[in-house]
Amino acid sequence: METRGLVSTIFIATFSVELSASPLSTQSDEQLFKKYALSSCIATYYKGSDVAKDAVTAMQGYREFSNLPLDAFFELSELLSNENIDSYKSKSGSSIELAYCLDFANSDEVHKLLTKAKSEL
């Protein structure tokens, strides 16, 4: 009887851990890296806002769950700082940062960094 209770307790504990596992743990390095790129861009262009703070927290999670070398994330930050957002203007002339960030995360440059990082694994 004691063994049955112990087995039940272990089963429940194991099942509970699986339920609380982060959805990030099932994402590929490519998904995590692209989401990191998007979050990094949002944190950069929306500095000081609540969404920027949330983006930084998301970046930490994406980096934590990724198996890619840390250098890839530093290189991505350098790439972002060297990019030019001037062409992302609405018809009225205002900047469209979010459109830029979406395109940046899916850009060839980010994909090249990802490919390079994967080759270093």
List PLM regions with ranges.
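Bacterial N-terminal signal peptides that target proteins for export
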Residues: M1-V7
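Hydrophobic alpha-helical context, especially transmembrane and signal-peptide helices
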Residues: V7-T9, E30
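Sec-dependent N-terminal signal peptides of Gram-positive bacterial secreted proteins and lipoproteins
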Residues: I12-T14
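N-terminal signal peptide c-region/cleavage motif recognized by signal peptidases
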Residues: S16-E18
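Compact alpha-helical subdomains of small soluble proteins
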Residues: G48-V51, A55-L121
